[in-house]
């Protein structure tokens, strides 16, 4: 209601008419006397500058004016197509002359390829090419992990070619990482003071002064977790005539466009991203590393060849950018009425 009134006020100010003469209806603000109208988007900046109405100033709609509330189910544009298997997800893309790619990535983040049997991969029927993908420099920061892409006429040939590579890796600095030992260190750190992000009062004193039996302590561990999206990452890239076109299930198409433009040294306006149904994202598909991988492989193929780069479920679990591992320790004082009187929360992540 507050946003509606602010939009109406912005429109009235533009038209220099009393706000009582305008009305927000179905994504527009109308001036019925003259037939003038503004879309909400046209008014958004001006509306944001309006004074936010106080609770007592809000004008709620009469139920007779409701368009959706109480009117039964609101239809979904693509629900029927999804239910019938007719909707297009990233894995569904089919283009003339398309080839398929999978990537052998290092088993440890930051690892480097030591050797691989490229000839064995190329002997697999249907395999067309082996393309090297350089690893990142500096922090990983959601960049491609590097490795060897096997390009083939179908995904089966690509995965069989990848298996034939038999890659050997140098694990690098992260090779000694061990999650159990890291958890023990987090459990140690979470019991001692650290950087304070918020403090109100003296929680530590309240805990020490609390009567016996009134202090409750709990500790929680969140391990490395893959996002495990229903559809693993997949992207198709075609480069032709100084332009690139992308078909992918992505949460951040602008990031995908910019990554491809940077990789191929193109202007952003020369990269088109077709956003397909997501198949689950959970934040994972806000990062365009898999689209970047596809653009690297497409660049190595004859111009105009559409390349679909596929992550298998195994790729997704092993090479996902995992959720942050953390240990959370909470201590609280609960009074006789069951109310929280003090709360201390420490996090090691």
Locations of the language-model features?
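Structural alpha/beta core scaffold segments of enzyme domains
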Residues: 1-349
């Amino acid at each position: 209601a507050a946003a509606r009134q602010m939009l109406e006020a912005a429109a009235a100010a533009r038209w220099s008419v009393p706000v009582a003469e305008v009305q927000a209806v179905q994504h527009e603000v109308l001036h019925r006397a003259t037939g003038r109208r503004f879309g909400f988007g046209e008014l958004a900046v001006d509306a944001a500058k309006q004074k936010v109405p106080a609770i007592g100033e809000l004008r709620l709609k009469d139920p007779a004016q409701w368009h959706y509330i109480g009117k039964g189910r609101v239809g979904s544009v693509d629900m029927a197509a999804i239910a019938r298997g007719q909707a297009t997800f990233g894995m569904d893309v089919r283009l003339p002359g398309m080839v398929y790619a999978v990537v052998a990535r290092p088993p440890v983040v930051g690892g480097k390829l030591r050797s691989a049997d490229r000839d064995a991969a190329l002997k697999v029927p249907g395999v067309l090419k082996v393309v090297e993908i350089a690893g990142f420099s500096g922090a990983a920061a959601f960049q491609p992990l590097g490795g060897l892409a096997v390009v083939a006429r179908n995904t089966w040939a690509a995965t069989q070619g990848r298996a034939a590579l038999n890659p050997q890796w140098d694990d690098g600095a992260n090779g000694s990482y061990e999650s159990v030992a890291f958890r023990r260190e987090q459990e140690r750190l979470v019991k001692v003071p650290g950087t304070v992000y918020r403090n109100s009062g003296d929680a530590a004193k309240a805990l020490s002064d609390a009567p016996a039996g009134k202090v409750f302590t709990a500790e929680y561990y969140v391990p490395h977790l893959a996002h495990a999206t229903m559809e693993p990452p997949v992207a198709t890239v075609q480069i032709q005539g100084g332009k690139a076109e992308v078909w992918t299930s992505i949460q951040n198409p602008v990031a995908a466009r910019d990554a491809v433009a940077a990789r191929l040294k193109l202007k952003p306006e020369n990269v088109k991203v077709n956003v397909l149904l997501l198949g689950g994202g959970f934040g994972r598909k806000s990062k365009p590393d898999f689209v970047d991988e596809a653009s690297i492989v497409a660049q190595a193929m004859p111009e105009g060849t559409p390349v679909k780069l596929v992550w298998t479920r195994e790729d997704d679990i092993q090479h996902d950018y995992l959720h942050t591992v953390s240990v959370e320790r909470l201590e609280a004082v609960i009074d006789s009425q069951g109310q929280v009187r003090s709360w201390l929360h420490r996090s090691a992540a």
